[in-house]
Structure formats: C-alpha cells, structure tokens
C-alpha cells in the first residue's frame, strides 16, 4: 500500500474513533463542539449538546456546513450525546 493510502487509512480510523462512543457513559467527541450555525442564512431550528450544562439546547442553524454537533430533533441529540 502506498504511503498516501496508509495516510488516508490512518485519517479515516482517527475520524471513526472520534465519532464513535467508547461506552454508554461516554459520548462522541463531536458532542463537545460549540453550536455552529454555519455560513448560510437559513433559519432552521436545530439542537446541539452543551457539555457544560450536560443537556441538549435549541439554536438557529443556517442550513449548511456547521459541525457534527447539530441535530434535527432534541431526541436525536439526547440519544447521541446525552445518553
């Protein structure tokens, strides 16, 4: 395997580890990211996990980019980050 292929594999494994909870008490690392509305101008209701308050909160999402700590429903947020 070429060095580029190995580097890509290492990057994918690192990303997978960051997005996968270690146990039921832990949550994915992206749950620690702040709410990010992104650069677009939409006004969509979304939810993010707030690690300081240890709960999911509502925010306005612009509709593009942002980060993985953005959920369409509070249930999805809680299931992913607050469980």
Curated annotation (Swiss-Prot):
Residue numbers marked as site, Reactive bond for chymotrypsin: 41-42
Compartments, as annotated in UniProt: Secreted
Keywords, ordered alphabetically: Disulfide bond, Protease inhibitor, Secreted, Serine protease inhibitor, Signal, Toxin
Domain of life: Eukaryota
Listed GO CC annotations: extracellular space
A GO term for molecular function: serine-type endopeptidase inhibitor activity
Signal peptide: 1-24
Any Pfam family the entry gives: Kunitz_BPTI
Expressing tissues: Expressed by the venom gland.
BPTI/Kunitz inhibitor domain span: 31-81
Primary site of residence: secreted
Paired cysteines (S-S): 31-81, 40-64, 56-77
Function: Serine protease inhibitor.
Family, per entry: Belongs to the venom Kunitz-type family.
Protein name, UniProt field: Kunitz-type serine protease inhibitor mulgin-4
């Amino acid at each position: 395997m070429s060095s580029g292929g190995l580097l890509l594999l290492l990057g994918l494994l690192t990303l997978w580890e960051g997005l996968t909870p270690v146990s039921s008490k832990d949550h994915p690392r992206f749950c620690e990211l702040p709410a990010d509305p992104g650069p677009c101008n939409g006004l969509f209701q979304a939810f993010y996990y707030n690690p300081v308050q240890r709960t999911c909160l509502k925010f306005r999402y612009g509709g593009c980019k942002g980060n993985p700590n953005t959920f369409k429903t509070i249930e999805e947020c809680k299931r992913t980050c607050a469980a």
